């Protein structure tokens, strides 16, 4: 298969990841408006984020083995088609319960995209080049996360919170059609299909058991669960923090959070430099330290102008740490890479849901400064521990 064809497929998958990123974070700046429109507490409004993450996490247990069995890119293409319908349902529902159901559907369908795309890259790109290729692929997701927050805040302030979902609907429909055409040009050698033993549920359980039988897998999965809880448990409430503590408009608070994505881009575009400069262990340690510093600054420094570099450093630190965890995930169980990366993504999003749910319940009790501080300190502890374990694994 030609390098140019691989590049085109990766770009297409990155565009799909852009849509997935928008879906993930589109609700963050909408929470205040949702609480007003539906006459519900802010913590209850945050369930639109929580249910997406829970659905996304559990759905990985299905899509990972499906990708291994039927072809990863094919499942991504069909998943994008379903994502288009899910976004449409989010935009047309008129009840909060209906919105929650639509967000569950959106989480399930979005689960088919990024992990299987990462697993396919793991199939076709050698390990030595995989981290930089994955970083470039994730540019789509990074931009999607930032665009989702920005678009959500912009629509709430100037139009209507439903508007972005129709844009997401069209986006997924277009990329689904394109991927359907690309699949026909892929040689059979790229459709790596692994058939597990048994049938149905027993086969799926067996594939995940193979992943968990690897001791290092447990360490990676625990770390990414705690990382997801701390990072996105904080990120979901940064717009509310800026709005309530610094009197920043919802649109502007969404724009501030875009800087989180720009920090990620700073890592992705210079990934070869960061990897060669710090190595895996250094990226974990530096990323955790940057995130802790950024969140403590956001929580307690009273100067609004510091919010901009703090959000940027938060994003840079996150992608330093998370990209390194991702590269470890692709190599946890190479013979079951789809299931392994799916387990990784499942733990990540279950962690996100846990973090948002906990912070949502504590928001009115302790306030956002305490929530952001606790998240930052947890990231420092988790990152330092994993860096130490990774160093021991390298030296032994």
Stretches with model-predicted labels:
Residues 2, 184-220:
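Juxtamembrane intracellular "pre-TM" segments in multi-pass secondary transporters
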Residues 39, 71, 92-98, 109, ...:
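Helix-breaking motifs and short loop linkers at transmembrane-helix boundaries and internal kinks
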Residues 58-94:
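Conserved MFS/SLC helix-loop-helix module at the cytosolic interface between two early adjacent transmembrane helices
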Residues 60-71, 267-279, 363:
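Helix-to-loop junctions at the C-terminal end of transmembrane segments
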Residues 82, 86, 97-105, 305-313:
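Paired small-residue
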Residues 98, 126-127, 136-183:
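Helix-loop-helix hairpin linking two adjacent transmembrane segments in secondary transporters
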Residues 102-140:
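Cytoplasmic helix-loop-helix junction between adjacent transmembrane helices
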Residues 281-325:
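C-terminal transmembrane helical hairpin of 12-TM major facilitator-type secondary transporters
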